[in-house]
Amino acid sequence: RFIYKKLDFTVNEDGVAFKNTSMVLPGESIKKHLYKCDSAICMAVTISEGIDRQLRVLQLTDMAKALVFDSLASVAVEQACDKVEELLREEYPDYYQTFRFGIGYGDLPISMQEPFLKVLDAGKKIGLNLNKSYMLAPVKSVTAVIGLTKEPVSTKNRGCATCNLNKTCAYR
């Protein structure tokens, strides 16, 4: 299941402000990601609550199977995101797309999941919600921003090497 919205935005000192919403995504990373973009796609994808239930059962009965199942479910949600990107290329053929920039990437706080899901009405439309730690439920879900631009986009600017936090990241 998925949902997306094409939104216009402005960039200011606070971050990226999406028009006709109250959402402002803070940080330099998202500003850099949407540099020279005309608009953005805010998207959310989830594969199923049933996956979460089955994973919990396997974690209690067979951890090896749980590990494999978890990995396969991660691949499945990423493939679902790829399909949404294909759909977007068909719907907006005159635009180049940036890569998927997930909520929580770079210096964009994970707490932005809450306003992001509200803008999409994701809870009601695809059953995607948050826990108190801003983790998505169902777990095998993705939220992301894709920029749309008339100019070709480099896909090289991905990963730790280009992240604003690459010198101070606790995960490196």
Regions found by a protein language model. Give the residues of each.
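Generic structural signal of hydrophobic/aromatic residues within well-ordered alpha-helices
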Residues: 30, 51-55, 88, 113-116, ...
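Long, amphipathic alpha-helical coupling/dimerization segments that relay conformational signals between
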Residues: 58-107
